[in-house]
Amino acid sequence: MLCQFSFKNFKSYKDETVFDMQAANLPEFAENIIYCKPASNLLPVAAIYGPNGGGKTNMLQALTCLISTVVKPIYDMEKTRTKLIVQQKVSCTPFLFDEKTSNEPTEFLLYFRTNGYEYRYYLSMLHDEIIAEALDRKKIGGKRTAHVFDREEKVITLGSSINKASINRDVNPKMPYLSFLAINYDIPAINDAQKWFESCIIRSYANTEAELQIMLSDNKTIRRQIISALNDMGIDINGYRYDNDSKQLIMQRTLHGKTYELSYKDESDGTKKLIAALPILLIALAEGRLAVIDELDAKLHPKLLRYIIALFKNPKLNTHGAQLIFTSHDIATMKNTVYRRDEIWFAAEGDNHSSELYSLYEIRKENNERINNTAAYDKQYLEGRYGADPYLQNMLKDGEWQ
């Protein structure tokens, strides 16, 4: 599970930016968080809003960049330990609107939990070369942190959990040492960290191959869940198959006792989007994975988006700590009946063309009080009260077109 992610000098983000999935002490939806006693509780969902060009996608790309940098060398060497589902490579690009930062490293810091431990992974990159890297871990709820390894350019130090005598410290400057160790050695702490990175789902709607593989697999439970979820959302499908001749996914419906078939390509855009998204979301729920999806709401009715959010926020369905992080323009879903205040995030362009990221929970009113959990989040957002100025406020001021 993802606890916290921070990064600096990546694309539109110049300064250190922190994205936190640790649940704040809030009264609303207390029953829907992921309880992790004795450690801090975590959020199952986070939605990022903001204007086009504000930095929503770049925030997800920062996380994707870190994950793919670790996973790609392992995948290329066919040493993966977990089935990859739609991971994509994102290059490491610094903030370019400043002569200084354009030649400085990009930094990432990630806290995540897996297999009874909380890990801290740090990576500093200058374009595609590793400048510094470190991995530490401690037992969940524990106080003592164990050093796994530390890397400062060519100098690598190993912690007590690694048999130093048998470990090669000569590594390609473009390869993370975490990836190098995962490829060449069998080290429990490295294996656990590697499996977590590989389990992350990074969604690209340009590629539906992974979804087809899941839908057409022999896993009867997943097939049944996909059909059941589609039915729950008002899409009356009772089966599907793949036609090898036409290379098309065929959706099956029964009407008055007769089965009719319709090609996937002939379904509505919203139905196609939902069919494409559901398999990976159900896999994430079943296996406790992190799913990262850009513009999840595109072409989806708000009711369908709320259904997907509710799947992850339901502790009876989300029994393995699955998490969903996505960007959205769907203001109709920005409601106090859908989200906690710490589950809503905003990305907006600040000074010097640099993006800023903050949660609704962090915002203070003029009297220094937080936004109330009974507030009309969507209305106040459109009024520009949350700082991530939506286009409506910029176009219309004092009742006049600007």
Locations of the language-model features?
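C-terminal lobe/lid and adjacent interdomain/linker elements of RecA-like ASCE P-loop ATPase modules
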Residues: M1-Q4, L255, A310-Q402
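Conserved ABC ATPase signature
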Residues: V45-Y49, Y242-L282, L290-K303
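Electropositive, glycine-dotted interaction segments
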Residues: T114-Y242
